[in-house]
Amino acid sequence: MNLLPIILILTCLQSPEQMSEELKASFLIGARVASHQRAVPIVNQVVLVPNEATYLNEISKWSTEGQYPVLFDSDPRASQFIRKFKPKLILRANTVESSKEPIIVQCRKAVASAWGALNGETSIREVLAQRNKKPLGVVITNEQDPARTAAVALAAAYGQPIKFIGKWGSGNNILNAEETSALMKRVNSVLTETGYAYGQLGDEIDSITMCMSLPSRCEFTGARENPIAISDFIGRHQNGSRFAWTGWIFGSKSDAAYMAMCSLFLDRSAYWFCNTYQDSENWKMYGLGNIENMLPKAGLQCEIIDGTLRGLQEADIGGITTDVMLMNSKGNVDFFDMKNNRSSPASIPILNTPSALMMIHSWSLKNPTERLTVGGMWLSRGVYAYIGSSHEPMLNAFVPPTEMMRRLMSGFPFLVAARWHDGQNIFAKPWRVNTIGDPLMLCPPKNFILRQKLEPALSEVYTDVMLEVKQAMERANKEPSDVHFAQAMQLTTLIGADEITYGLWSAALERNVVGAQTAKRALPSLFRLEHADAFIWAYRIVLNPNRLERDMLWHLCSLKTVTPIDILMKNVRTPFACDDIALIAPRILKTHGSQGVLQLITKALKKANGRNKRELERMRKTYGG
């Protein structure tokens, strides 16, 4: 076993005899997860499924002898995961027809089967008892909620009971005190039903994963001020004391499954930091300290970008490829401040591969289901674990970055590491930081968990996606058309072969068959390869570019003075037009004069409100309007 975490425990935190029960429990839960993962090999394949029935069938094939990622065949999530995981085999499962059994029974069967249950048994407790094993936590979902796909995967992977409760709302709502009390009673009821001890940290149940839509905030009588974060309420007693750490997963079937699979199967060895705080007073403590020296000693990569808006924009040309991100900023739900400028969620980097994120910022997760917020945009980019606030938290509510890294290197799970322990800080009480994702996910030093990788095997119930790629490319060559090249490029993008996609794009150009479909399939690869000229050419013939495609245009091309100004002027993004116009206004002034800038501002003002409206009105005065 790697001794680095033990050394860090002794030197960076406190001696074992001084540890609080909560601190001991933090180490214990991380150690239990690590022990479990070392014992369960990963099969080096990804299986793509067309529907939930096929998904559940694949999860039921898992065992303690081998588990593998199962993803819905939906982009951009599937290709994003594959680019990071780099499987030896990518398989497409044959469709399994939907079962007539209640979905609760189907989910429980899949979980129990992954632990050796026979003849359709549904009790994970009985199966675990036969193995003399205690669960690592409990997973709670709703039978009608699409995020049940994550619940099944996490329950099956770790051997956790899966429990079902009713609906409790979603989005930007706030549970009132009466509703919060009722939710506490319901959660406690299902925890009691498991038959495992859960009343205090360090007993049998120390983690709860809520896989369902919930309001991000609630009013709790045990809090010193309301509202508080929903995930910092669940797992506490009425007096506010914590008995479990909670993670929260929500979203579509595809997105929820993606979040679970990222947590379970991806390595996290590359870290990315963006520090926008001044090096003074309390802000300094929330800077990066000695992180740049600490992480390489743990065998981890460390990238620190300039905290200016320009620095962020330059780092994002072609997208960001990393595993764990930490960014600090001031701001609100719809903007964030860099060192020198204020910007909108539109400037949040595009992620080429999945990432976990700690965002030290106020309000970012106020309404995480709304894409055009800071938190919602990060999640739409492919963040699968997220530490952030859902209300004004105060800076000290966050664990400082250097302390966060020490905890992670010492074996704390990612979401657990973000919580203050009782007695350390007044914000250890129920407060406003939400923790999205799997609460058991680790971010340890390199080689701390060496999971065995098993060779995959192809069988008649699967199709090899590489065979599909070969056939599609051959068809495009023999019968060149916009449709056929687009089909081939969709597959090469899925398997993470951007250079091959670019080659197909070039071949389609040579054969004079490029059309809107081919262009649309080319854009993501051209973006990641930073082929700006080709990207612009393709973008011009895409019909009705979607939000992500517009973001790629701006993130790749807006800083380049050779980019034709007309394409940027025609693609100013709402509802944050002020930031786009501010970026290109100097170029418009040179080519179209002040009237060109004012026309763009006047058009944007028709739909503007809030900060966007105020900034546009200020700019209008600046340019003589």
Predicted regions, residues:
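Sec-dependent N-terminal signal peptides
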Residues: 3-12
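N-terminal low-complexity, Pro/Thr/Ser-rich intrinsically disordered segments
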Residues: 15-45, 116-120
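Structural register within alpha-helical repeat arrays
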Residues: 488, 521-522, 584-585
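Terminal, low-structured helical/coil segments at or just beyond the last alpha-helical repeat
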Residues: 598-625
